[in-house]
Amino acid sequence: GGGVAIIADDTVVVIDVVVIGGGPAGSACALALHGAGLSVAIADKEVFPRDKVCGDAIPGPTFKTMDKISAEWGKSLREFAHKEEIRTSRCYVPNGKSFAINWKAYSYNSPRLNFDNFLMNLVRTETKTEIFENKRLKELVVEKDFVLCKFLDNSSCKAKMVIGADGANSVVRRYVPLSQSSKKYTCAAVRLYAENVSDLEPATNEFYYLKNYLPGYLWIFP
């Protein structure tokens, strides 16, 4: 790592960038900052590998973004083993009819348990980012020259910049002067993994739109 540390007293060095959350957004941020001459740390409340409720679809722009960061990392992302390549999305509308969208860009489905851990391992092995797991953010204290990040285990760190990549229940967001989210912009997801599902089109993600749940939908992603 880069030699920064999270400790319990106030003598800790000021880290240039602390990313709260080590999912795809946080990991991509750390990868993008590699080589910028900054000290970087990621703090995540979980220990990797860890799961997230998601449809597990990894769309085309993901790979283009990684290519911009590093062609080598983009290649490794395409060659990732835990995947099901997808070429088509089929959408079923409320009257039962459907239409298909055939994608030119490369994409696949991958369980978040595996995908997120792959990205975190890229950060771990290819950058000097310090990774602190099992670190749940409690609060931020904004001082003149730094932000003090306080964690639930009573440890803390100082940062010149804090990036909130801590998801739907973001702690960082509470300290950003934006309008708070309302029920209008809130949604929930329920996911299960099923085996031996029959009558699936090859390399196809299926979306089912029902009148009572618009703009929500049901999905079957192989």
Residue ranges and their predicted role:
Residues 15, 37, 159-160:
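Short, well-ordered alpha-helix to beta-strand connector turns
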Residues 28, 61:
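Short alpha-helical segment within the catalytic ATP-binding CA
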Residues 125-222:
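Predominantly flavin-linked oxidoreductase catalytic cores and closely associated redox partners
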Residues 12-25:
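Beta1/beta-strand and adjacent pyrophosphate-binding region of the FAD-binding site
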Residues 5-11:
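Ala/Thr-enriched low-complexity intrinsically disordered regions
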